């Protein structure tokens, strides 16, 4: 059965949440751009932590060209389950296309942060934004008391990039330098973890007439 395009479009996840949770365990599993993309993806999760998006939907939210995301689906599988499914389309030459259902991992209490959707409005390159999320994940009381060399080694990044990104964050008012390191100043961007809601678990329900079907008298 072919489905009109307008119905297919309505199947994508279009409702944005006010926040996204990010587990600290993924800090070294994604590079900065992909970590920010993961944040954007998570903002559009449903109650079961599922997101039905195409690459073009993600590119639209991150402000990138689709070509920049050519390896995203492969890379993101380091932190979540991506299920592929066939979708019929109303096209004269093509009967179906393949879609992705991203399954956001559940909250790993207490080792996670809660980041406001307002972060998407911060005017910084996505590499810098992803780097900032990494800092939030490893900071203690919003402070990082490491030298540039040690921080670069910890994050698996180059020292020059760390230095450059820190300066960008300082100019954006998201970081201030202190003796022996720096302090993050996310203000309203970093939310209290108490507001975070764990994902719901989907439990298949038998049809209403299941009992009648099972115990139908002979």
Residue positions per predicted region:
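Electropositive, intrinsically flexible nucleic-acid-contacting patches
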Residues: 1-218
């Amino acid at each position: 059965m072919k489905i009109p395009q307008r119905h297919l479009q309505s199947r994508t996840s279009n409702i944005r949440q006010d926040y996204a949770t990010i587990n600290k365990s993924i800090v070294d599993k994604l590079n900065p751009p992909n970590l920010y993309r993961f944040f954007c993806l998570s903002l559009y999760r449903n109650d079961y932590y599922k997101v039905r998006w195409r690459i073009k939907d993600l590119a639209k939210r991150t402000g990138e060209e689709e070509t920049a995301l050519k390896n995203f689906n492969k890379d993101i599988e380091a932190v979540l389950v991506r299920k592929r499914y066939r979708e019929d389309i109303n096209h004269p030459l093509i009967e179906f296309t393949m879609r992705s259902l991203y399954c956001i991992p559940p909250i790993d209490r207490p080792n996670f942060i809660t980041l406001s959707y307002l972060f998407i409005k911060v005017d910084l390159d996505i590499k810098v934004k992803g780097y900032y999320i990494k800092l939030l994940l490893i900071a203690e009381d919003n402070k990082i008391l490491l030298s540039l060399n040690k921080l670069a080694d910890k994050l698996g990044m180059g020292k020059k990039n760390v230095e450059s990104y820190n300066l960008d964050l300082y100019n954006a008012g998201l970081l201030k330098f202190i003796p022996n390191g720096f302090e993050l100043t996310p203000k309203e961007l970093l939310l209290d973890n108490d507001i975070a809601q764990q994902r719901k678990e989907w439990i298949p329900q038998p049809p209403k007439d299941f009992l009648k079907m099972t115990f139908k008298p002979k």
